[in-house]
Design a protein with these regions (language model features):
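Glycan-recognition and catalytic cores of secretory/periplasmic carbohydrate-active enzymes
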Residues: 20-401
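Bacterial Sec-dependent N-terminal signal peptides
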Residues: 1-25
Length: 401
Protein backbone atom coordinates (compact mmCIF):
# COMPACT_ATOMS: atom_id res chain seq x y z
CA UNK A 1 0.00 0.00 0.00
CA UNK A 2 2.84 2.37 0.88
CA UNK A 3 4.48 1.75 -2.51
CA UNK A 4 1.16 2.43 -4.24
CA UNK A 5 0.75 5.76 -2.47
CA UNK A 6 4.32 6.80 -3.27
CA UNK A 7 3.87 5.76 -6.89
CA UNK A 8 0.64 7.74 -7.22
CA UNK A 9 2.31 10.77 -5.67
CA UNK A 10 5.18 10.60 -8.15
CA UNK A 11 2.81 10.17 -11.09
CA UNK A 12 0.67 13.09 -9.86
CA UNK A 13 3.79 15.22 -9.62
CA UNK A 14 4.76 14.32 -13.18
CA UNK A 15 1.28 15.25 -14.41
CA UNK A 16 1.21 18.56 -12.53
CA UNK A 17 4.41 19.80 -14.12
CA UNK A 18 3.05 18.94 -17.55
CA UNK A 19 0.23 21.46 -17.12
CA UNK A 20 2.50 24.49 -16.82
CA UNK A 21 1.58 26.99 -19.54
CA UNK A 22 4.29 26.83 -22.17
CA UNK A 23 5.06 30.53 -22.00
CA UNK A 24 5.72 30.59 -18.27
CA UNK A 25 9.16 28.96 -18.23
CA UNK A 26 11.62 31.40 -16.68
CA UNK A 27 14.63 30.61 -18.85
CA UNK A 28 16.97 32.98 -17.01
CA UNK A 29 16.07 31.35 -13.70
CA UNK A 30 16.84 27.94 -15.19
CA UNK A 31 20.16 29.19 -16.58
CA UNK A 32 21.02 30.76 -13.22
CA UNK A 33 20.41 27.35 -11.69
CA UNK A 34 22.77 25.76 -14.23
CA UNK A 35 25.40 28.37 -13.40
CA UNK A 36 25.11 27.57 -9.68
CA UNK A 37 25.38 23.84 -10.33
CA UNK A 38 28.40 24.38 -12.59
CA UNK A 39 30.16 26.24 -9.78
CA UNK A 40 29.30 23.38 -7.41
CA UNK A 41 30.83 20.87 -9.80
CA UNK A 42 34.01 22.90 -10.20
CA UNK A 43 34.32 23.17 -6.43
CA UNK A 44 33.84 19.42 -6.14
CA UNK A 45 36.52 18.71 -8.76
CA UNK A 46 39.08 20.82 -6.93
CA UNK A 47 41.42 18.95 -4.61
CA UNK A 48 44.37 20.07 -2.50
CA UNK A 49 46.58 19.64 -5.55
CA UNK A 50 44.18 21.48 -7.86
CA UNK A 51 41.95 20.21 -10.65
CA UNK A 52 42.87 17.30 -12.90
CA UNK A 53 41.67 18.63 -16.25
CA UNK A 54 41.81 15.19 -17.82
CA UNK A 55 39.08 13.87 -15.50
CA UNK A 56 35.58 14.61 -16.80
CA UNK A 57 32.30 14.34 -14.87
CA UNK A 58 30.27 11.44 -16.28
CA UNK A 59 27.42 10.46 -13.96
CA UNK A 60 25.92 10.48 -10.49
CA UNK A 61 23.99 7.37 -9.56
CA UNK A 62 20.57 7.68 -7.94
CA UNK A 63 21.93 6.81 -4.49
CA UNK A 64 25.00 9.06 -4.79
CA UNK A 65 25.64 12.77 -4.30
CA UNK A 66 28.90 13.34 -6.17
CA UNK A 67 30.15 13.05 -9.73
CA UNK A 68 31.86 9.91 -10.94
CA UNK A 69 34.60 11.15 -13.25
CA UNK A 70 36.33 9.35 -16.09
CA UNK A 71 39.65 9.96 -17.77
CA UNK A 72 39.50 11.75 -21.11
CA UNK A 73 40.63 8.93 -23.37
CA UNK A 74 39.72 7.92 -26.90
CA UNK A 75 37.36 5.33 -25.42
CA UNK A 76 35.42 7.77 -23.22
CA UNK A 77 32.77 9.06 -25.60
CA UNK A 78 31.29 11.50 -23.08
CA UNK A 79 34.50 13.45 -22.40
CA UNK A 80 33.49 16.42 -24.57
CA UNK A 81 30.23 17.22 -22.79
CA UNK A 82 31.65 18.78 -19.62
CA UNK A 83 33.86 21.23 -21.54
CA UNK A 84 30.78 21.98 -23.65
CA UNK A 85 28.72 22.68 -20.53
CA UNK A 86 31.39 25.11 -19.38
CA UNK A 87 31.38 26.92 -22.73
CA UNK A 88 27.61 27.25 -22.61
CA UNK A 89 27.76 28.49 -19.03
CA UNK A 90 30.40 31.03 -20.04
CA UNK A 91 28.20 32.16 -22.92
CA UNK A 92 25.42 32.92 -20.43
CA UNK A 93 27.40 34.29 -17.48
CA UNK A 94 30.39 35.87 -19.27
CA UNK A 95 32.36 34.75 -16.22
CA UNK A 96 36.06 34.84 -17.16
CA UNK A 97 36.90 32.15 -14.62
CA UNK A 98 34.43 29.79 -16.29
CA UNK A 99 36.04 30.57 -19.64
CA UNK A 100 39.47 29.71 -18.23
CA UNK A 101 38.17 26.40 -16.90
CA UNK A 102 36.48 25.65 -20.22
CA UNK A 103 39.77 26.23 -22.02
CA UNK A 104 41.68 23.93 -19.70
CA UNK A 105 39.22 21.06 -19.92
CA UNK A 106 38.90 21.51 -23.68
CA UNK A 107 42.66 21.36 -24.18
CA UNK A 108 42.67 17.90 -22.62
CA UNK A 109 40.99 16.61 -25.78
CA UNK A 110 43.46 17.97 -28.34
CA UNK A 111 45.12 14.56 -28.62
CA UNK A 112 42.05 13.24 -30.45
CA UNK A 113 43.01 15.32 -33.50
CA UNK A 114 46.39 13.60 -33.69
CA UNK A 115 45.56 9.89 -33.46
CA UNK A 116 43.64 7.43 -35.64
CA UNK A 117 39.91 7.17 -35.07
CA UNK A 118 38.90 4.77 -32.32
CA UNK A 119 35.23 5.07 -33.24
CA UNK A 120 32.64 7.51 -34.54
CA UNK A 121 32.25 9.54 -31.33
CA UNK A 122 34.72 12.21 -32.42
CA UNK A 123 31.91 14.64 -33.09
CA UNK A 124 30.59 14.33 -29.56
CA UNK A 125 34.10 14.59 -28.18
CA UNK A 126 35.47 17.47 -30.23
CA UNK A 127 32.58 19.48 -31.63
CA UNK A 128 30.80 19.82 -28.29
CA UNK A 129 34.03 21.10 -26.76
CA UNK A 130 36.19 22.73 -29.43
CA UNK A 131 33.18 23.59 -31.58
CA UNK A 132 31.59 25.69 -28.87
CA UNK A 133 34.96 27.05 -27.87
CA UNK A 134 35.66 28.25 -31.39
CA UNK A 135 32.18 29.70 -31.80
CA UNK A 136 32.69 31.85 -28.71
CA UNK A 137 36.39 32.75 -29.01
CA UNK A 138 37.40 32.30 -32.67
CA UNK A 139 40.65 30.80 -31.41
CA UNK A 140 42.39 29.57 -34.61
CA UNK A 141 43.99 26.68 -32.74
CA UNK A 142 40.51 25.38 -31.94
CA UNK A 143 39.53 25.56 -35.59
CA UNK A 144 42.52 23.47 -36.61
CA UNK A 145 41.68 20.79 -34.07
CA UNK A 146 38.15 20.57 -35.47
CA UNK A 147 39.38 20.37 -39.08
CA UNK A 148 41.94 17.69 -38.28
CA UNK A 149 39.44 15.66 -36.27
CA UNK A 150 36.85 15.86 -39.04
CA UNK A 151 39.40 14.36 -41.43
CA UNK A 152 40.01 11.60 -38.91
CA UNK A 153 36.31 10.85 -38.57
CA UNK A 154 35.98 10.59 -42.35
CA UNK A 155 38.48 7.71 -42.40
CA UNK A 156 35.69 5.55 -40.96
CA UNK A 157 33.47 6.19 -43.99
CA UNK A 158 32.90 3.14 -46.20
CA UNK A 159 31.96 4.27 -49.73
CA UNK A 160 30.54 0.85 -50.60
CA UNK A 161 28.08 1.01 -47.74
CA UNK A 162 27.69 4.78 -47.74
CA UNK A 163 27.95 5.33 -43.99
CA UNK A 164 30.52 5.91 -41.28
CA UNK A 165 31.54 2.83 -39.33
CA UNK A 166 30.50 3.44 -35.74
CA UNK A 167 32.23 0.73 -33.74
CA UNK A 168 35.27 -0.92 -35.34
CA UNK A 169 35.70 -2.87 -32.11
CA UNK A 170 32.37 -4.66 -32.63
CA UNK A 171 33.01 -5.89 -36.17
CA UNK A 172 34.44 -9.27 -35.19
CA UNK A 173 32.98 -9.95 -31.72
CA UNK A 174 29.39 -9.43 -32.89
CA UNK A 175 29.90 -10.32 -36.54
CA UNK A 176 28.75 -6.85 -37.54
CA UNK A 177 30.84 -6.32 -40.72
CA UNK A 178 29.93 -2.63 -40.95
CA UNK A 179 27.84 -1.22 -38.13
CA UNK A 180 26.31 2.23 -37.92
CA UNK A 181 24.40 3.45 -34.88
CA UNK A 182 21.80 6.19 -34.78
CA UNK A 183 23.99 8.29 -32.48
CA UNK A 184 26.29 8.75 -35.48
CA UNK A 185 23.87 11.29 -36.95
CA UNK A 186 25.10 13.80 -34.38
CA UNK A 187 28.68 13.54 -35.58
CA UNK A 188 27.75 14.75 -39.06
CA UNK A 189 27.53 18.35 -37.85
CA UNK A 190 31.30 18.48 -37.43
CA UNK A 191 31.79 17.23 -41.00
CA UNK A 192 29.42 19.85 -42.41
CA UNK A 193 31.11 22.58 -40.40
CA UNK A 194 34.60 21.56 -41.48
CA UNK A 195 33.62 21.39 -45.15
CA UNK A 196 32.45 25.01 -45.15
CA UNK A 197 35.20 26.37 -42.91
CA UNK A 198 38.32 25.53 -44.86
CA UNK A 199 38.28 21.75 -44.61
CA UNK A 200 38.03 19.17 -47.37
CA UNK A 201 34.79 19.64 -49.38
CA UNK A 202 34.59 15.83 -49.49
CA UNK A 203 33.45 15.92 -45.87
CA UNK A 204 30.14 17.40 -47.00
CA UNK A 205 29.65 14.49 -49.38
CA UNK A 206 30.40 12.00 -46.61
CA UNK A 207 27.82 13.59 -44.32
CA UNK A 208 25.13 13.65 -47.02
CA UNK A 209 25.80 10.06 -48.07
CA UNK A 210 25.60 8.93 -44.45
CA UNK A 211 22.33 10.78 -43.91
CA UNK A 212 20.82 9.33 -47.08
CA UNK A 213 21.75 5.72 -46.38
CA UNK A 214 20.62 6.04 -42.77
CA UNK A 215 17.29 7.49 -43.90
CA UNK A 216 16.82 4.55 -46.25
CA UNK A 217 17.89 1.68 -44.01
CA UNK A 218 17.82 2.69 -40.36
CA UNK A 219 14.08 3.21 -39.91
CA UNK A 220 10.98 1.07 -39.83
CA UNK A 221 7.93 1.92 -41.99
CA UNK A 222 6.44 3.90 -39.07
CA UNK A 223 9.60 6.08 -38.85
CA UNK A 224 10.82 4.62 -35.58
CA UNK A 225 14.52 3.89 -35.60
CA UNK A 226 16.73 0.92 -34.98
CA UNK A 227 19.70 1.62 -32.75
CA UNK A 228 22.15 -0.30 -34.95
CA UNK A 229 22.13 -0.97 -38.68
CA UNK A 230 24.44 -3.80 -39.77
CA UNK A 231 25.63 -3.73 -43.38
CA UNK A 232 27.37 -6.09 -45.78
CA UNK A 233 30.74 -4.61 -46.74
CA UNK A 234 30.75 -6.36 -50.13
CA UNK A 235 27.32 -5.36 -51.41
CA UNK A 236 26.64 -2.40 -49.14
CA UNK A 237 23.21 -3.84 -48.38
CA UNK A 238 21.52 -3.83 -45.00
CA UNK A 239 21.84 -7.15 -43.19
CA UNK A 240 19.67 -6.33 -40.19
CA UNK A 241 18.53 -3.64 -37.81
CA UNK A 242 19.07 -4.40 -34.13
CA UNK A 243 19.29 -2.73 -30.76
CA UNK A 244 22.20 -2.36 -28.40
CA UNK A 245 20.87 -0.03 -25.73
CA UNK A 246 17.12 -0.30 -26.33
CA UNK A 247 14.66 -2.84 -24.93
CA UNK A 248 14.47 -5.03 -28.04
CA UNK A 249 15.26 -4.97 -31.74
CA UNK A 250 11.69 -3.95 -32.56
CA UNK A 251 11.25 -1.18 -29.98
CA UNK A 252 11.68 2.59 -30.09
CA UNK A 253 14.58 3.45 -27.83
CA UNK A 254 13.93 7.02 -26.72
CA UNK A 255 17.42 8.45 -27.01
CA UNK A 256 17.99 6.79 -30.36
CA UNK A 257 14.90 8.49 -31.74
CA UNK A 258 16.11 11.73 -30.15
CA UNK A 259 19.41 11.46 -32.03
CA UNK A 260 17.44 11.00 -35.25
CA UNK A 261 15.33 14.11 -34.62
CA UNK A 262 18.37 16.22 -33.81
CA UNK A 263 20.48 14.77 -36.59
CA UNK A 264 18.05 15.30 -39.45
CA UNK A 265 17.29 18.80 -38.25
CA UNK A 266 21.01 19.56 -38.61
CA UNK A 267 21.19 17.89 -42.03
CA UNK A 268 18.35 20.09 -43.27
CA UNK A 269 20.05 23.19 -41.88
CA UNK A 270 23.28 22.37 -43.69
CA UNK A 271 21.79 21.24 -47.02
CA UNK A 272 18.44 23.05 -47.23
CA UNK A 273 17.15 19.95 -49.04
CA UNK A 274 13.43 19.70 -48.18
CA UNK A 275 13.52 15.90 -48.07
CA UNK A 276 15.47 16.12 -44.81
CA UNK A 277 13.02 18.60 -43.32
CA UNK A 278 10.15 16.29 -44.22
CA UNK A 279 11.98 13.36 -42.68
CA UNK A 280 12.85 15.30 -39.53
CA UNK A 281 9.14 16.09 -39.15
CA UNK A 282 8.16 12.44 -39.57
CA UNK A 283 10.64 11.05 -37.03
CA UNK A 284 9.58 13.82 -34.66
CA UNK A 285 5.86 13.14 -35.05
CA UNK A 286 6.12 9.49 -34.03
CA UNK A 287 8.12 10.53 -30.96
CA UNK A 288 5.71 13.29 -29.90
CA UNK A 289 2.61 11.15 -30.44
CA UNK A 290 3.76 8.61 -27.87
CA UNK A 291 5.04 10.88 -25.10
CA UNK A 292 3.60 10.71 -21.59
CA UNK A 293 1.80 13.77 -20.28
CA UNK A 294 4.86 15.56 -18.92
CA UNK A 295 6.71 15.21 -22.26
CA UNK A 296 9.65 13.30 -20.76
CA UNK A 297 9.82 9.85 -22.37
CA UNK A 298 10.20 6.49 -20.80
CA UNK A 299 13.67 5.24 -21.62
CA UNK A 300 12.15 2.97 -24.29
CA UNK A 301 8.66 3.66 -25.60
CA UNK A 302 7.91 -0.07 -25.74
CA UNK A 303 9.20 -1.20 -22.36
CA UNK A 304 6.45 -3.52 -21.06
CA UNK A 305 7.11 -2.16 -17.57
CA UNK A 306 5.52 1.21 -18.41
CA UNK A 307 4.28 3.15 -16.41
CA UNK A 308 6.80 1.88 -13.85
CA UNK A 309 9.73 2.01 -16.28
CA UNK A 310 12.38 4.74 -15.81
CA UNK A 311 12.15 8.03 -17.68
CA UNK A 312 15.03 9.39 -19.76
CA UNK A 313 15.59 13.08 -19.16
CA UNK A 314 18.55 13.03 -21.54
CA UNK A 315 16.30 12.14 -24.48
CA UNK A 316 13.91 14.94 -23.52
CA UNK A 317 16.77 17.44 -23.42
CA UNK A 318 18.10 16.37 -26.83
CA UNK A 319 14.66 16.62 -28.41
CA UNK A 320 13.85 19.96 -26.77
CA UNK A 321 17.03 21.42 -28.22
CA UNK A 322 16.33 19.95 -31.65
CA UNK A 323 12.71 21.13 -31.69
CA UNK A 324 13.72 24.70 -30.94
CA UNK A 325 15.81 24.69 -34.09
CA UNK A 326 13.20 22.75 -36.05
CA UNK A 327 10.62 25.37 -35.07
CA UNK A 328 12.58 27.94 -37.06
CA UNK A 329 12.00 25.87 -40.22
CA UNK A 330 8.44 24.66 -39.54
CA UNK A 331 5.43 26.39 -37.95
CA UNK A 332 5.39 24.11 -34.91
CA UNK A 333 7.59 22.46 -32.32
CA UNK A 334 8.43 25.40 -30.09
CA UNK A 335 5.55 24.90 -27.66
CA UNK A 336 6.38 21.21 -27.28
CA UNK A 337 10.01 22.08 -26.61
CA UNK A 338 9.01 24.58 -23.93
CA UNK A 339 6.76 21.98 -22.30
CA UNK A 340 9.72 19.58 -22.20
CA UNK A 341 11.99 22.21 -20.71
CA UNK A 342 9.32 23.18 -18.20
CA UNK A 343 9.15 19.60 -16.99
CA UNK A 344 12.93 19.26 -16.90
CA UNK A 345 13.13 22.52 -14.96
CA UNK A 346 10.70 21.29 -12.32
CA UNK A 347 11.66 19.85 -8.94
CA UNK A 348 10.93 16.36 -10.27
CA UNK A 349 13.80 16.47 -12.75
CA UNK A 350 16.26 19.08 -11.51
CA UNK A 351 18.83 17.79 -9.04
CA UNK A 352 18.51 20.88 -6.86
CA UNK A 353 20.65 20.81 -3.76
CA UNK A 354 20.83 17.00 -3.69
CA UNK A 355 23.56 16.77 -6.37
CA UNK A 356 25.72 19.17 -8.41
CA UNK A 357 24.32 17.91 -11.73
CA UNK A 358 21.56 19.81 -13.52
CA UNK A 359 19.15 16.91 -14.00
CA UNK A 360 18.02 13.61 -12.51
CA UNK A 361 16.37 10.58 -14.14
CA UNK A 362 18.37 9.65 -17.23
CA UNK A 363 19.07 6.15 -18.49
CA UNK A 364 22.38 5.28 -20.10
CA UNK A 365 22.48 1.59 -21.03
CA UNK A 366 19.57 -0.43 -19.67
CA UNK A 367 20.58 -3.84 -21.13
CA UNK A 368 23.99 -3.50 -19.44
CA UNK A 369 22.37 -2.33 -16.18
CA UNK A 370 24.47 0.82 -16.50
CA UNK A 371 23.51 4.37 -15.49
CA UNK A 372 19.88 3.58 -14.69
CA UNK A 373 17.86 6.52 -13.32
CA UNK A 374 21.06 8.53 -13.03
CA UNK A 375 22.33 12.04 -13.59
CA UNK A 376 24.38 11.86 -16.80
CA UNK A 377 26.55 14.61 -18.24
CA UNK A 378 25.07 14.61 -21.74
CA UNK A 379 21.61 15.28 -20.29
CA UNK A 380 23.05 18.40 -18.67
CA UNK A 381 24.77 19.42 -21.90
CA UNK A 382 21.65 19.30 -24.05
CA UNK A 383 19.54 20.86 -21.30
CA UNK A 384 21.69 23.99 -21.06
CA UNK A 385 21.99 24.06 -24.86
CA UNK A 386 18.20 24.00 -25.17
CA UNK A 387 17.77 26.73 -22.56
CA UNK A 388 20.22 28.97 -24.39
CA UNK A 389 18.46 28.30 -27.68
CA UNK A 390 15.14 29.29 -26.16
CA UNK A 391 16.68 32.44 -24.67
CA UNK A 392 18.11 33.41 -28.06
CA UNK A 393 14.78 32.88 -29.81
CA UNK A 394 12.96 34.98 -27.23
CA UNK A 395 15.52 37.74 -27.74
CA UNK A 396 15.17 37.66 -31.52
CA UNK A 397 18.55 36.02 -32.16
CA UNK A 398 19.37 33.01 -34.33
CA UNK A 399 18.80 29.75 -32.53
CA UNK A 400 22.42 28.58 -32.77
CA UNK A 401 24.12 31.70 -31.48
Amino acid sequence: MKKLVVGLAVMLGFCMCAHQPSGTLDVNKALDYCAEQTQRTLAELKTDSGIDYTMMPRNIMADEQHWNCRKATKEEWCAGFWPGVLWYDYEYTQDKHIKEEAEKFTNSLEFLSKIPAFDHDLGFLVFCSYGNGYRLTKNPAYKQVILDTADTLATLFNPVVGTILSWPREVEPRNWPHNTIMDNMINLEMLFWAAKNGGNPYLYDVAVAHADKTMKCHFRPDYTSYHVAVYDTITGNLIKGVTHQGYADSTMWARGQAWAIYGYTVVYRETKDPKYLDFAQKVTDVYLERLPEDKVPYWDFDDPGIPDAPRDASAAAVVASALLELSTYLPNGKDAAIEMLSSLSSRHYQSGKSKPSFLLHSVGHWPNHSEIDASIIYADYYYIEALLRLKRLREGQTVQG
